[in-house]
UniProtKB/Swiss-Prot annotation:
Its EC number is 1.3.1.98. Residues 19-187 form the FAD-binding PCMH-type domain. Its cofactor is FAD. One of its GO terms (cellular component) is cytosol. Cell wall formation. Pathway: Cell wall biogenesis; peptidoglycan biosynthesis. It comes from Prochlorococcus marinus (strain SARG / CCMP1375 / SS120). The gene is murB. One of its GO terms (molecular function) is UDP-N-acetylmuramate dehydrogenase activity. This is UDP-N-acetylenolpyruvoylglucosamine reductase.
Amino acid sequence: MLNTNIKPSKKLAKLTTWKIGGQAEWLGEPENIQEIIQQISWAKERNINCEIIGAGSNLLINDNGIQGLAICMRKMHGYELNNRTGIVEALAGEPLPNLARKVAREGLHGLEWAVGIPGTVGGATVMNAGAQGSCTADRLISAKVISPKSGNIYEIKKKELEFSYRQSLIQKEKLIVLSVRFHLEPGHSEEEVLNSTNINLHHRLKTQPYHLPSCGSVFRNPANLKAGQIIEELGLKGLREGGAEVSTMHANFIVNKGDATAKDITQLISIIQKKVEKKHGFILQPEVKRLGFH
């Protein structure tokens, strides 16, 4: 009998911030750690592939969809905090901007940069998301993860997670984040931390195209360079491929103008890479996770 939170033939476009992608053969939406363990076990018993969707940012799903089980973590949210010690534990599906606001109201310093990141705690940990010179690894103590292959659960400390720019051991080993522990700095006033948080949010709203569907930043920044600046200097703002467009607001964003497909996005990424390589001699590396492509 099917787990009640696993459903067949579900459209995935609405679960991504690009609003793009085909169907999942199966879709699981766990609400707690026990349910995700059951869903991974369900997939393992049937020998089918298991893919994770967090907030759906930084994600491109094939127009033809995904074979196997897609697990969307959005319903698996919640957190506990101690405003005396600054210890915060959040479930993987907790939206990062929500957590940033909640801890700010408790006078906890350390996540102000995260208020404009359109992702979940789990997704941010997997790719070591960051902004304004800070990143997820800065305040992380440990992550509880599950292996989809073995079903084993581990708590991995920060030093063993091999964090680097937009990389982690979790990403390399294809582990699934269940929850994350952070150590934030207590003792600040709510007003002070909220003010800093709001300044970061307003900066992002002024400089990034939040009014249109996008995945967030498309390319990793090369060493000591900004991908957006490189693309802008080549005059590529506004470049279109089908319904996909290089944002006129920030060149490291590709926006969906209403009817973009994964094929449009893929082709536009390729065009940008070729133009940058021709001019600068290196290939910009996407930070977008691709699902359903072979």
